[in-house]
Curated annotation (Swiss-Prot):
Organismal lineage: Eukaryota, Metazoa, Ecdysozoa, Arthropoda, Chelicerata
Protein role: Blocker of A-type voltage-gated potassium channels of cerebellar granular cells. May also inhibit Kv4/KCND when coexpressed with DPP6 or DPP10. The occlusion of the outer entry of the K(+) conducting pore is partially reversible and affects both open and closed channels. It shares the same target in rat brain than BmTX3 (AC Q8I0L5) and AmmTX3 (AC P60208). Recombinant toxin inhibits mKv1.3/KCNA3 channel (IC(50)=0.49 nM).
Family assignment from sequence similarity: Belongs to the short scorpion toxin superfamily. Potassium channel inhibitor family. Alpha-KTx 15 subfamily.
Protein name in UniProt: Potassium channel toxin alpha-KTx Ctri9577
Entry note about domains: Has the structural arrangement of an alpha-helix connected to a beta-sheet by disulfide bonds (CSalpha/beta).
Domain of life, source organism: Eukaryota
The UniProt record lists the keyword Zinc: no
GO molecular function (one): ion channel inhibitor activity
Signal peptide start-end: 1-23
Disulfide bonds: 31-53, 38-58, 42-60
Localisation: Secreted
InterPro entries: Scorpion_toxin-like_sf, Scorpion_toxinS_K_inh
Amino acid sequence: MKLVMRILLTCFLLTTLVIKAEGQIHTNQPCTSNNTRCRTYCIKVHKINSGKCMNSKCVCHP
């Protein structure tokens, strides 16, 4: 029974992570709160029309 619960919990957590991650791309592009640079990067590289600096990395939002 414990194994079944563990499998279900793992599936639930993975699904939650996937849903949260969908719609934004966390890149390894370094940035210093310069959102303009991130927007340019997101448009050029990922064809996504907006991006912002979070935790010194660019995050692209469609």
